[in-house]
């Protein structure tokens, strides 16, 4: 089973190139691939891409080169084109492509259940509510999973108690853009999930690679980076990422629990969509298997405070409970991001 980061395919030409390059990499053919579909499958290349991200329908073609492809939908850009959510879900069902991360209209949710090599799995998807509340769906009643982290933890535990033979994986859309380190709260949440028996915790959204750690024999990948989000197409062509965002990693988990890391270069300067750099064990990957993974909670809080990238009047989440303090921090983040969006959108509109 192979987990990949954020994917946004702007048009059929890019989709065909990506699929051809994936095939040439030689690591996808016999895999169940789980990838974050960053943005809806759009029925046509949209003309309005101002501050929006989507996927061309050529993304469906991934199923032709993999044993199975599964799309994670719990991300904020699904709300960029709300009118396309139901057509997307219908298309995925028609194409027999499993997906997860969509909530019921009342906010309740269930994992995707499937079988792999005789082993039963369940995958939970979740998006940090800061992002769904700064990019709201005001057009339809479709919802992605964005409950509080405390509720997510409790619901995962309830599910595991009622499904004791099933291996559970959590696929989480969290953290700030370009933040290299997970919040201390994310460490605690991931550790608590593993302590209760979750098989793996996989994170996305930061658009850069983050730490990967082995905790009690289970893998936690806090951020896989951009699997494929090419520069110069989205946000009316203005969305571009720094060089470090063009390196990404795929985490392969075998039925026996073995871990391989597939390191890729994506959207390369020479025009390739994807190139395989190397495949290594986690123990061989010193860049991602970082010393701070061995820190205790207090030491990591100090490390994060000193080394975090996002600093300007930005709160730190040290716990994931529903405390008043965390609710205030969350509300402040929502206010700050909304204010920044308004200012940047005003600037960008007048530069078009």
Regions found by a protein language model. Name each.
Residues 44-65, 166-198:
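Active-site-proximal segments of metal-dependent phosphoesterases and phosphodiesterases across multiple
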Residues 70-142:
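Extended active-site neighborhood of metal-dependent phosphoesterases/phosphodiesterases
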Residues 11-23, 115-168:
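Binuclear metal-dependent hydrolase catalytic cores centered on His/Asp/Glu-rich metal-binding motifs
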Residues 11, 238-352:
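A short C-terminal boundary segment appended to hydrolase-like catalytic domains
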Residues 1-54:
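N-terminal active-site segment of His-dependent metallophosphoesterases
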Residues 3-5, 32-38, 68-76, 99-103, ...:
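Active-site neighborhood of phospho(di)ester-bond hydrolases with catalytic His/Asp-centered motifs
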Residues 67-70, 184-249:
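Conserved beta-sheet core of the metallophosphoesterase superfamily
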Residues 10-13, 41-44, 76-89, 105-111, ...:
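Active-site environment of divalent metal-dependent phosphoester hydrolases
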């Amino acid at each position: 089973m192979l987990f990949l980061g954020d994917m946004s395919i702007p048009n059929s030409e890019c989709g065909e190139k990506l699929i051809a390059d994936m095939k040439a990499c030689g690591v996808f053919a016999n895999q169940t691939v789980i990838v974050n579909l960053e943005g809806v499958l759009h029925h046509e290349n949209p003309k309005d891409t101002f501050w929006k991200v989507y996927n061309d329908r050529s993304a469906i073609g991934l199923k032709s080169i993999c044993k199975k492809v599964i799309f994670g939908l719990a991300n904020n850009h699904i709300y960029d084109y709300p009118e396309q959510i139901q057509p997307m879900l219908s298309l995925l069902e028609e194409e027999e492509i499993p997906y997860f991360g969509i909530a019921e209209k009342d906010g309740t949710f269930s994992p995707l259940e499937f079988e792999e090599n005789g082993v039963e799995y369940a995958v939970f998807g979740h998006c940090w509510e800061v992002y769904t509340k700064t990019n709201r769906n005001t057009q339809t009643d479709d919802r992605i999973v964005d409950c509080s982290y405390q509720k997510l933890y409790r619901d995962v535990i309830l599910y595991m108690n009622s499904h004791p033979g099933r291996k559970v994986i959590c696929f989480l859309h969290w953290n700030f853009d370009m933040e290299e380190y997970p919040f201390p709260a994310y460490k605690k949440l991931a550790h608590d999930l593993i302590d209760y028996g979750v098989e793996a915790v996989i994170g996305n959204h930061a658009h850069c690679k983050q730490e990967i750690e082995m905790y009690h024999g289970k893998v936690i990948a806090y951020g896989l980076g951009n699997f494929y989000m090419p520069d110069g197409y989205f946000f009316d062509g203005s969305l571009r990422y720094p060089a470090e965002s063009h390196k990404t990693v795929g985490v392969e988990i075998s039925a026996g629990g073995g871990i391989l890391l597939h390191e890729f270069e994506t959207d390369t300067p020479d025009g390739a969509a994807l190139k395989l750099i190397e495949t290594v064990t986690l123990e061989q990957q010193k860049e991602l298997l970082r010393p701070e993974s061995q820190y205790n909670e207090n030491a990591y809080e100090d490390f994060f405070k000193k080394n975090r990238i996002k600093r300007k009047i930005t709160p730190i989440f040290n716990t994931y409970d529903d405390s008043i303090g965390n609710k205030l921090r969350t509300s402040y983040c929502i206010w700050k991001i909304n204010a920044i969006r308004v200012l940047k959108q005003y600037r960008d509109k007048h530069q078009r």
